[in-house]
């Protein structure tokens, strides 16, 4: 095995260890991973420009059927509210309910506590470097998976 291949194997191993840890330790307790992604988008979205299910699907790379299934479950649990546009009745907006905001804030706080421990261990400079490298790695993977996509589409 070449040095390059060994480095790639080590990267794969580190990636797998992190993935197994995250899945095995259920860091998210009240929401699924996809629900956290959707809640995070809705939480940060200005209230005067609500999102549609289609927009959420585009941002998460989930299929329309997956988004609808997730949103229906979230609505059943009173985490989101759907409202029809007054301008176009075909358009339905999705917003977090108060319960959704509370639940998301609780999940977010738990994840932030873990990231605070990483930040404390690495220090600010290395944490900034890690963040930049993770973003760059995500971009590389996105471009590898879809070489025709622009970085704006990602």
List PLM regions with ranges.
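N-terminal leader segment of winged-helix/HTH proteins
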Residues: 1-29, 33, 40, 77
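N-terminal positioning helix adjacent to the helix-turn-helix/winged-helix DNA-binding module
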Residues: 7, 34-38, 52, 99, ...
